[in-house]
């Protein structure tokens, strides 16, 4: 009898598929949060595999802050149409029409109103009792200590000091009416794992991940790509073409690029082999206050 062994990526894939199926079986109305990034793209592929050849039994939902890169929105719409996903797009239009943005109100207020509050409103609107997210434990310290099945109270708040025990692959999906669970099937993946899986599965991703000459301006130590005409006048004469790519994607004024020559998946994987910094070091919102990400998650952020 031959030995049956799984590779490292196959083990991660099997664990994630098990988690996704568990949620579909345990919850009445789950949703998969779709940020359009590399992790979301992997999570979507895993969901498709989990229920193939059938249709995935829950929708995708994107919280659009109205400040995403243009290429992200184009990719989102074409991907959902090509693969037949039920895509929900929600935004805080009241705050948007009031002129809320990262340049005028700062990253903290912008993130709270355009992302956190928009998310909480959408979860209540559709009465979702479970929401998949693409966060990984290697990204950031508050995410490192969060459970795979992360309990939220009726206000969608997370209490890191009151988390449920999670032994092996046994998950507690019980909630009372109004409570919910955030589920992170990629918790045990690393950034390198993500890229190797993208290469293995030939998963389509936003072109911003690949190095290219792009118009950038340095703001507070970050290389910010000038993606549209909302860049303040004071920075416009500082724009320079730089060979850059993005390790993580978000609102363009709050997401720093990294100088890189990696214009293929293979080169990105090679780059990941030697990097010593988390991709979150280029996200402005992670540093706008002490323990920034943990505080945002307590308030209901992704």
From Swiss-Prot:
Name of the protein described by the UniProt record: Sulfate adenylyltransferase subunit 2
Organism: Parabacteroides distasonis (strain ATCC 8503 / DSM 20701 / CIP 104284 / JCM 5825 / NCTC 11152)
Enzyme Commission number, as recorded: 2.7.7.4
Family listed: Belongs to the PAPS reductase family. CysD subfamily.
Assembly, per entry: Heterodimer composed of CysD, the smaller subunit, and CysN.
Pfam families tied to this protein: PAPS_reduct
Source organism, top-level taxon: Bacteria
Pathway: Sulfur metabolism; hydrogen sulfide biosynthesis; sulfite from sulfate: step 1/3
